[in-house]
């Protein structure tokens, strides 16, 4: 099946396989029955294809076979992803001893000034055995581990053991269980020799790179070897807002660069083609091990392997069939890739380059030199193909993405190849390796500078509808736009060439093109007008005199208090990117006082967003090494850090804050929720009528709330930050004493905990406390009303 010169014969089977995987991974219990049914249909269609030899029947048969393979893979793999022994432990809340092998490097980047430490951020691993009581069961289950990081840097493939509790993930998730470690991890054994070799290379290269100044040194490990640990939240946000995030980590295109170098160098010295191909395959395997098997790298490696074996067999290859075959093979190996955004974006970007780069180059060449047109067409093709999916991750369209990519992309191969050579040279010839790393730093710095510059420009992105509506709307507009401007059509390109496409007519009717252009422009104009109007209206309605702001950062707390030109941030939420977005939206560049109520991930996970921006931090009692590492990071970034307890006080502008909990001696209270720092902000005499008073309860449970009340009274306040995201574990007396006008709840939409609970909401209602919650209302801004005790509430969204 060909259209306009494009070889589409395997594209539809790949799409069908993708849909089958995406559907069946969500209902794995039905996989055996559906697999049998699909294979029954496949057998019938194959028989008809042989008998009739009709093209559409052959395509249908291939689609059924591809779907059958993926369905069978789901049926075979699903039980191992969520074995009964782990499901039982999760349901019963039992403590288990878990043995896992790590899937990523753990430990701190010592050379980075403000890099994320190991702390409480989760990491991916594979559970290999579980001990429940005296029973030990071998398993092979992908998990996401919270806590349980060893003190020393630990490479990929190391085996760790620790006690934990489990929570089953949704069947379609990329992991089978969430693992919550109850103690520190013990290293049982190191990685296998191949992974240990790669870990050593990555560690030495990251150390050498991050010793270099600026963002270039932090970006280079990701560009060359896929190590993104040094990329801070500000640089990460800049790369994303300019459509350069694919350069944050190693690109799948690097596989093609590596193979091309091997083949060309081998040909130059007269190495036979067969030997060159075998050498290329071996180098390809080593490259994947070194940079880690990220989805884009694996996709590119499989495509490269297909091309190499086809070349060895003397068979011609074309881009789209190779891409489709690689996608089918990978989905058959791991059907859960069908729900992996990275894999989807990698396939879409490659498809966009194969289908659109040629026509776009020819179109742009009418107005600019051909070479410049080609440079612009490549990122434009990739962005057009990927953007409908990208809006699911970030509902906005980067307006400078194409220009930023055109400027940054030429530097990427230089940074990658030179950096990779430096990585390999460091162990044998450190002086040569360090020289190459320094040279690779130059193009990496250029890429970082491009991202930072364009991210700082006004209107760097256009807001877009969220979810499926946004995807469909953008896909329709993109398709109509392509129909309108690409009147010359497309032809499939040879993988061995540029991948350009061109040739026959795709849309020859001028009338159709004009209608497509008109509809696309009408949709864009209508949406842009509505969006711009809504945004202007929202900005005009937003109170400039806000004193308390609750950021919408998902399931967690991040609340700002503003007084007298000074800013306090109480907790940071779970995600640096979401916190950065909130701070930027409110124009907050500096934090005078950071309060970390306790060290759970939903309260400190976003701390990397403010490292280097905090003057003073106050924290509660540490629960272990990971908490101490966060404190050390804050100190290294220039903050003065104090552990506080009941009775400590301080000033923030025209507010005096008092610590009400924990006590200096914890007694039976363990670090964590029940040792949360509880803070009251009260106006000084000069601002008695113009400043909001507030009470922040952290995640304090009912028992600790009662102990706090027993330690001394609390004053009535205007605003209370509700404890523990609205859980049922609350003391009614605290809210009676607080007499708050507004209760703020930091909570994630559709969270798995049932927060906020009906009991808490009823409790607040009984006290006459109005509820402002971030899951339904987004950003919440509070400012003083006209009368004493009156609070004006502005929310980003109206509650349903």
Model-flagged regions — what are they?
Residues 1-22, 167, 172-300, 308, ...:
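Aromatic-rich juxtamembrane segments at the membrane interface
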Residues 1-6, 61-246, 581, 590-592, ...:
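Membrane-interface helix/helix-cap signal primarily in integral membrane proteins
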Residues 1-86, 205:
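N-terminal leader/targeting segments
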Residues 353-459, 739-746:
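Alpha-helical transmembrane segments of multi-pass integral membrane proteins
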């Amino acid at each position: 099946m060909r259209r306009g010169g494009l070889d589409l014969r395997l594209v539809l089977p790949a799409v069908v396989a993708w849909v089958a995987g995406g559907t069946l991974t969500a209902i794995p219990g039905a996989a055996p029955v559906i697999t049998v049914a699909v294979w029954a249909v496949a057998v019938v269609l194959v028989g008809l294809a042989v008998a009739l030899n009709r093209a559409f029947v052959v395509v249908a048969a291939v689609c059924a076979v591809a779907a059958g393979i993926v369905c069978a893979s789901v049926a075979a793999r699903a039980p191992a992803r969520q074995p009964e022994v782990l499901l039982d432990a999760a349901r019963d809340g039992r403590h288990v001893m878990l043995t896992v092998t790590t899937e990523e490097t753990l430990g701190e980047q010592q050379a980075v000034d403000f890099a994320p430490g190991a702390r409480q951020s989760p990491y991916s691993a594979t559970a290999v055995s579980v001990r429940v009581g005296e029973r030990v069961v071998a398993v092979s289950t992908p998990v996401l581990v919270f806590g349980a990081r060893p003190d020393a840097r630990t490479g990929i493939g190391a085996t760790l053991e620790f006690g934990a509790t489990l929570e089953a993930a949704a069947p379609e998730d990329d992991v089978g269980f969430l693992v919550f470690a109850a103690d520190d991890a013990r290293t049982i054994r190191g990685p296998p020799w191949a992974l240990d070799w790669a870990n050593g290379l990555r560690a030495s290269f990251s150390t050498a790179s991050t010793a270099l100044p600026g963002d270039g040194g932090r970006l280079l490990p990701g560009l060359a070897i896929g190590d993104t640990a040094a990329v801070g939240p500000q640089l990460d946000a800049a790369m994303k807002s300019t459509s350069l995030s694919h350069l944050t980590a190693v690109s799948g295109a690097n596989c093609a660069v590596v193979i091309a170098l091997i083949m060309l160098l081998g040909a130059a010295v007269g190495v036979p083609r067969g030997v060159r191909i075998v050498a290329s395959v071996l180098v390809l395997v080593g490259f994947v091990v070194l940079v880690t098997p990220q989805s884009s790298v694996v996709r590119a490696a499989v495509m490269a392997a297909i091309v190499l074996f086809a070349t060895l067999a003397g068979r011609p290859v074309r881009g789209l069939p190779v891409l489709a075959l690689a996608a089918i093979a990978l989905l058959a190996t791991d059907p859960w890739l069908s729900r992996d955004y990275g894999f989807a974006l990698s396939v879409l970007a490659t498809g966009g380059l194969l289908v659109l780069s040629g026509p776009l180059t020819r179109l742009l060449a009418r107005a600019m030199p051909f070479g410049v047109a080609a440079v612009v067409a490549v990122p434009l093709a990739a962005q057009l193909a990927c953007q409908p999916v990208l809006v699911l991750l970030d509902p906005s369209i980067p307006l400078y993405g194409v220009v930023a990519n055109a400027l940054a992309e030429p530097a990427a191969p230089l940074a990658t190849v030179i950096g990779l050579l430096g990585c390999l040279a460091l162990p044998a010839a450190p002086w040569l390796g360090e020289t190459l790393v320094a040279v690779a730093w130059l193009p990496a710095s250029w890429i970082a500078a491009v991202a930072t510059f364009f991210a700082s420009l006004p209107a760097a992105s256009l807001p877009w509808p969220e979810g499926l509506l946004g995807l469909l709307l953008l896909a329709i507009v993109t398709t109509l736009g392509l129909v309108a401007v690409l009147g010359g059509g497309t032809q499939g390109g040879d993988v061995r060439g540029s991948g350009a496409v061109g040739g026959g007519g795709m849309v020859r009717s001028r009338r159709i093109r004009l209608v497509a252009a008109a509809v696309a422009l009408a949709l864009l104009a209508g949406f842009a007008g509505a969006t711009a109007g809504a945004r202007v209206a929202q900005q005009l309605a937003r109170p400039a005199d806000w004193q308390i702001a609750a950021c919408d950062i998902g399931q967690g707390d991040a609340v700002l208090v503003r007084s007298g030109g000074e800013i306090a941030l109480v907790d940071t939420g779970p995600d640096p990117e979401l916190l950065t977005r909130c701070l930027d939206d409110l124009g907050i560049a500096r934090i005078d006082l950071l309060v970390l109520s306790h060290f759970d991930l939903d309260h400190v996970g976003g701390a990397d967003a403010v490292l280097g921006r905090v003057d003073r931090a106050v924290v509660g009692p540490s629960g272990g090494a990971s908490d101490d590492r966060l404190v050390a990071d804050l100190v290294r970034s220039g903050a003065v850090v104090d552990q506080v307890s009941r009775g400590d006080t301080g000033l923030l502008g025209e507010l005096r804050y008092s610590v009400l909990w924990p006590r200096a001696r914890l007694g039976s209270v363990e670090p964590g929720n029940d040792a949360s720092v509880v803070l009251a902000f009260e106006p000084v005499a000069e601002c008695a009528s113009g400043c909001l008073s507030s009470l922040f309860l952290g995640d304090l449970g009912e028992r600790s709330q009662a102990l706090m009340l027993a330690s001394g009274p609390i004053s009535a306040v205007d605003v209370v930050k509700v404890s523990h995201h609205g859980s049922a574990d609350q003391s009614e007396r605290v809210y009676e004493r607080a007499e708050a006008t507004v209760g703020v709840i930091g909570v994630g939409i559709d969270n798995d905990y049932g927060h906020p609970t009906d009991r808490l909401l009823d409790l607040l209602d009984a006290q006459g406390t109005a509820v402002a919650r971030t899951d339904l209302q987004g950003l919440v801004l509070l400012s003083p009303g006209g009368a004493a005790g009156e609070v004006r509430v502005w929310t980003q969204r109206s509650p349903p």
